[in-house]
């Protein structure tokens, strides 16, 4: 009969400074299926190290170890995990149950890593616990169970995937005599059912209950009572209800997500404090994007209210150059020539001056602008009362005037409707035909008085001149204002025979404002991103602490068959989940901030663009991956023996 477990010349040494301490020396041993073996020895004899090598938790420094003919040294980490998962079941002296899980959930862990279907593993866990007399303790957590009951849960976990080989390390060491007897009776029964049971103990009474006793001292096998397998070996039951590889991967991810969520819920305060940096960072980024967009839209709306797609044409070379000849370059005919161009929506000649206004005993100074009939369309001005100028008023040099709200309040402090009233502009009587409404603007409203007359009235009746101070044109929306500006300059240069005018494109102001707003928003976003990175570093720090605190849990998971990728995935998912939940709460906080800001700034419109929300989630995920990778990698690299030894 071939040996199930075969060791040849096994040695195990550990470094101690510059020396090597040999714990096992030339151990040669064969264990057959169906045996109940007791390995007995005093503390420091090497019995626990031998058990760890038998259970593939540790590897020998020298020698050869075969499991069912397979040389263990030829297996990689994942293959070793599969061997532990599918062939071995561990029973520890201190039970090594996960305190935040129920008895059933603890028993299910090996089957989760084996990729078993959820319903099948749950049914088997309940069945095993029932067989061990714990049917009424299925949903109890370890802290609610006695020592004997916890050890029975540990036995059920060892049997979950079949447990062909049961490795029991001092299984009765932490139990009272009655509970110890019950555990030994269960182990004997398992041996009778076909399981290979290996007990590591220092107690001769426990060892005497085994069929075979191997004594170890100072790393050497001192005695071996020999193999006594006479019964027929039966097939050990195992959990065979597996799922397809794709569904298995999805199932493992789903379980890792569920376990990560449970770990977060168990440590609520720590999780919340970990999230705090992410919440503030995400809220900052989203709020800056939303409020920045609202502020930019408000400013641009105000600029466009002043004039959009407009070009101002001035005589001379530039502002501040006072040349009497160039000052007279613009004529009414130039405005007429521009008006017929296909890219022009509206044109208005302009003449400006400062004059006295009188009504009764009220005498004030006001800015006066002579304009064309399309001026109010060019500047998108709204009328509170009346209308603008008609072509007929322009042609007959009408003594009509449009005033602003400031002028109305000054000249008619107690009168609401002023249409048809006559005021003196200089010495010329003029009838009011319209009142311009105030603009609601982030820039505020002007306190100056401003009135408008037909430009023909200004040139002939008040100023006695034929040239213009400027011409304002509005370009059609489907034309590029920059191209239109070039064509206007070319047209007037051709008409005048030289370039004696210059232009001011209001769209350049709009673009400059957009650029400034974008730059400011980018700067504030970078500040918010820095806070987000700080939050990410906080997540990494807490996760590193979590790995240290949960080292024993990691060792337990590895002992029952978790791959390094399973451990890495679980801690990475925890980090990502913390960041995603923090991201959701951060977005919620930004909605609250925007709601408060909306109450304070009713003229602004706060819109949460999908791209901003998607960016927030993308940032949360990226931070979870980036700052969760190091803790996850550290967790996956832990040695299961060292991890299990941690308290």
Curated annotation (Swiss-Prot):
The chain crosses the membrane at residues 272-292, 522-542, 576-596, 610-630. Keywords: Antibiotic resistance, ATP-binding, Cell inner membrane, Cell membrane, Membrane, Nucleotide-binding, Translocase, Transmembrane, Transmembrane helix, Transport. It is a multi-pass membrane protein. The keyword Cell inner membrane applies. GO terms for molecular function: ATP binding; ATP hydrolysis activity; transmembrane transporter activity. GO terms for cellular component: plasma membrane. Residues 5-243 form the ABC transporter domain. SMART domains: AAA. The keyword Cell inner membrane applies. It comes from the Bacteria. It is an enzyme of class 7 (translocase). Its EC number is 7.6.2.-. Pfam families: ABC_tran, FtsX, MacB_PCD. It is found in: Cell inner membrane. ATP binds at residues 41-48. GO terms for biological process: response to antibiotic. Homodimer. Part of the tripartite efflux system MacAB-TolC, which is composed of an inner membrane transporter, MacB, a periplasmic membrane fusion protein, MacA, and an outer membrane component, TolC. The complex forms a large protein conduit and can translocate molecules across both the inner and outer membranes. Interacts with MacA. Part of the tripartite efflux system MacAB-TolC. MacB is a non-canonical ABC transporter that contains transmembrane domains (TMD), which form a pore in the inner membrane, and an ATP-binding domain (NBD), which is responsible for energy generation. Confers resistance against macrolides. Belongs to the ABC transporter superfamily. Macrolide exporter (TC 3.A.1.122) family. This is Macrolide export ATP-binding/permease protein MacB. It comes from Photorhabdus laumondii subsp. laumondii (strain DSM 15139 / CIP 105565 / TT01) (Photorhabdus luminescens subsp. laumondii).
